[in-house]
């Protein structure tokens, strides 16, 4: 499991790639901390209601759940979350994996600049290395044979 500081740094980095303000990093991390793995869909998911938003807000030191709701909307607009029903959000596996987030032991980002810029994310789960490629589609996940060093 990644330390909380590493999770925050990772989230800040991927938000910066999509020009999402830094203030939403705490909301993304707080939401991810309360999310569970939906095995049927192969992604992390959270069901939010007023109580859950209040709890996330309280943990972040916010006075009301309003900023949490706004943050979820902003994260959805940027493609990090997908609202599948009212109050049900799925985390984009291209950024958060297709396995339980708690199993991630290490995560790396590689940014390539050129005629076509892209960003590759490598996550280490136990002995497995999984590469997530940024794509316009919500889900692009591939198993990688690359060494993680």
Segments predicted by a language model, with ranges:
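Polar/charged alpha-helical tracts
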Residues: 9, 13, 42, 54-60, ...
């Amino acid at each position: 499991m990644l330390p909380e500081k590493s999770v925050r740094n990772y989230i800040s980095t991927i938000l910066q790639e999509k020009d999402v303000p830094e203030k939403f990093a705490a909301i993304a991390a707080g939401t991810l901390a309360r999310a569970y793995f939906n095995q049927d869909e192969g992604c992390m998911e959270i069901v939010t209601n007023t109580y859950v938003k209040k709890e996330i807000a309280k943990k972040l030191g916010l006075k009301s759940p309003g900023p949490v709701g706004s943050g979820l909307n902003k994260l959805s607009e940027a493609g990090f979350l997908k609202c599948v029903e009212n109050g049900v959000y799925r985390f984009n596996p291209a950024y958060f994996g297709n396995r339980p987030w708690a199993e991630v032991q290490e995560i790396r980002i590689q940014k390539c600049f050129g005629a076509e810029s892209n960003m590759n994310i490598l996550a280490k789960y136990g002995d497995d290395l999984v590469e997530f490629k940024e794509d316009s589609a919500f889900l692009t996940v591939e198993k990688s044979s690359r060494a993680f060093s």
